[in-house]
Amino acid sequence: INFGCPVKKVVSKGAGAGVLKDVDLMVRLTKAVVNSTHLPVTVKTRLGWDVDTINIEEVALRLQDAGIKALTIHARTRSQMYKGEADWEYISKIKQNPNIEIPIFGNGDIDSPEKALEYKQKYACDGMMIGRAAIGYPWIFNEIKHFFETGEKLPEPTISDRLLAVKQHAEWSAEWKGERLGLIEMRQHYSNYFRGISHFKEFKTKFLQVLSLEEF
């Protein structure tokens, strides 16, 4: 259950991080889901609505009592959106609470294998969730896994690797949305896949003109 989305159009409907203003409602919603499925239910949320209403410890305890099997904490408030640094000290505090027994996953600002290992060791979380850093860069998960296991960094994906990933993404998008609409929606992803590639601008116009899978 995502109680962490800070986007205005979501929050304005009382969804996502908007539920942080009403913990009782959050608990009722969570219990309803837990009681309606045999599957394990997990929750993602934020520290609180703003700096004056940080309530993550209460939320963690009450959601645990509601029956969730794990909690992911994005270490910012809703009012922060994605600005400033995520404050993982709150995650550490939750992990140190002897009354909280469910796995706690940290989220926010993990964008490299080195930072992932540093934060895991420093804040003792049970795992991590990665969001923005994986947009257009799905290799980050394997890079982190490899770094944890060996202490070595994998080489960055080549241009060919990126092209293959874009093609696969485009095929899935076309399968899901239909070829024309799926490829139009792909336009928002090309820059992310080729972030940091100096000569990508030369090909961007061609990518934006692609309207069929055959053109890949």
Predicted regions and their residues:
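N-terminal small/glycine-rich loop or linker at the start of catalytic domains
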Residues: 5-15, 30, 34-42, 47
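Glycine-rich tight-turn/loop motif centered on a GG-T
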Residues: 8-26, 79-88, 152-153
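Short coil-to-beta-strand
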Residues: 2-3, 63
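Active-site mouth loops of central-metabolism enzymes
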Residues: 19, 45-56
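Residue-level signal for pocket-adjacent positions within structured domains
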Residues: 5-6, 14-15, 77, 105, ...
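Active-site beta-loop-alpha junctions enriched in small/polar residues
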Residues: 4-6, 44-50, 74-78, 107-111, ...
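Alpha/beta catalytic cores of nucleotide-metabolism and tRNA/nucleoside-modifying enzymes
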Residues: 28, 36-38, 52-70, 82, ...
